[in-house]
Amino acid sequence: MRSDTITQGFERTPHRALLKGSGVPQSQMDKPFIGVATSFTDLIPGHVGMRDLERFIEKGVHTGGGHAFFFGLPGVCDGIAMGHKGMHYSLPTRELIADMVESVAEAHRLDGLVLLTNCDKITPGMLMAAARLDIPCIVVTAGPMMSGRGQEGRKFSFVTDTFEAMARYKAGVISERELMVCEENACPGIGSCQGLFTANTMAILTETMGMSLPRCGTALAVSALKRRIAFASGEKIVELVQNNITPRSILTREAFENAIRVDLALGGSSNTVLHLLAIANEAGVELPLETFDILAKETPQLASMNPAGEHFMEDLDVAGGVSGVMKQLGDKIKDTQTLFGLTTRQLAASVENVDETVIRPLTNPVKKEGGIAVLFGNIAPKGAVVKQSGVSDKMMKFEGTARCFDSEELAMAALMEGEIVAGNVVVIRYEGPKGGPGMREMLAPTAALMGLGLGDSVALITDGRFSGGTRGPCIGHISPEAAQGGPIGLIQDGDRISLDIPARRLELLVDEAVLQARAATWVAPPPKIAKGWLARYAKVVTSAHTGAVTTAE
């Protein structure tokens, strides 16, 4: 075992002495050393419940014959970080988490890892570390929050009843009292936000790829099932160490394709494009951006999930969960291995009944194409991403007049002051991985568009990204970004922009000669942040079309 490096032989007397100083008895020195990477924090609801799950994981590890060691990782909530300087740090924490897991596992020669995670960037960061290390690992996602409940059976959700409600209040659609009712009921307890936002989408894809146990991706944070999954995961990691089953044997090209298909079938978060590209990069799997669009054209959307639809994670769980989605997808799902022994098709076959009011059959889809589309054009030569499951039929094709803003704050101010009108295309730039830095989520302006009733008359494009809670005609991940001299930085107020999602095109209707003249006079703006971690990050992060990963160069 890897841990023999620090536990065996007289040369390791100092190492054993330190371990004994931590309370490890001699009898445990020949047991598998299992690291439990926990992102517990009492700052955010998605991670508050992890102390309980830690206990059950530890019990499982010891029952399985291993010895558990806890170490901590940061957990950032995109909702709390939204709309201010804090959002610059969200995506970069994905890289920090991957590096921290790698550092602890290698420094202390851990034999295997249980990765306890939940919210947006923590899960992909841990999966990146698992693929990079390629030692036995299992993921436990802490589970989604229940929907909020109100009178007359009303269900509340975080994005619809906070960010969008804020704009409805500003527009005079709801009263201050109604806004407070939303605030009090939107988040009723622990767990990741209730809809198919980034955290829950990543939990589902982790299960789809076979890196977590069945139903881990959908079991509610408050459920006893989640505790049992935590215990079983602790037991399982010891078995994985004994059999040397490692992530790269699970994270194959076919497993990534299955994850993309499930993502498309559910209409998941556009952030998953960034994260799957980054995880595949660590796993040594070639996964071009175009793969998402190729699969989208042949994978129907089978569920209508919040925020764009009516169903919540609690509905998906009882309807059949991830295995139920794979069952409905049939032969579109490839038969891949999971870390718990069963193949994906065996899991799908194990589901006896699927609630087809939630997860529809292929013969009766919500939409003929999957939830994510990749666009190209002279604004996005290397690609852009749209969550087409959240776009109304009316806005699938649109032409409008550009209103340009060099930051999210400037765009948000214009929206709240009523300066954006029907027929506009809001352009938010210098918010990419380098230019932001950190590729901030534009949830506040996109939610404002919907709350102000502009979702069917105004489009938004950006080199930043969007929350999993975003809906509406919002195109992000535009590559190359403005800070790298991308064409989005050449757009001027009054230019006409054409959006054609069915044709996968995003075009600036300006003569090429005019664009070349603008490019000749373009000057890169100074960095927005010139010191600290983000300044270093901006120098080494790649473009969105490659997953916004950091490089050694």
From Swiss-Prot:
Cofactor binding remark: Binds 1 [2Fe-2S] cluster per subunit. This cluster acts as a Lewis acid cofactor.
E.C. no: 4.2.1.9
Annotated [2Fe-2S] cluster binding sites: 119, 193
Pathway where it operates: Amino-acid biosynthesis; L-isoleucine biosynthesis; L-isoleucine from 2-oxobutanoate: step 3/4; Amino-acid biosynthesis; L-valine biosynthesis; L-valine from pyruvate: step 3/4
One GO CC annotation: cytosol
Quaternary data: Homodimer.
Protein name per its UniProtKB record: Dihydroxy-acid dehydratase
Organism: Pelobacter propionicus (strain DSM 2379 / NBRC 103807 / OttBd1)
Gene that encodes the chain: ilvD
